[in-house]
């Protein structure tokens, strides 16, 4: 069995939703708007800030259990979806209620550069083939809420976007 640790919009991914998921904690990293989507949630002209994992702290997300017969297909799909030269595909240990598991995680090298007002404006302006920046944050906020997880950054930004 393979595991995938989801911490951003991947938590709302329809393909992964077919597999059992459990809350999981990744120590040593936290969520930040550390990347840009220029295709899925944004465009080259109006890139959408998206979440990445940056060193320090901890991050709660979901660990999806992928059966062996689906591992190669899921890995290819995720590599295509998550591919960006800033990201490194690595295996990390994540803690779940049933113990530690080794999971695929995409980790960033650096954090956000925008203040809250600039980040909000960029999210409102972004539109891509999957959706817009506001929908991106909604997807993450709802997935966190659905699983009883909390992230102050995501929740504060979502509140700003819907007000």
Predicted regions and their residues:
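A glycine-rich, hydrophobic/aromatic-adjacent loop/helix-cap motif
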Residues: 1-163
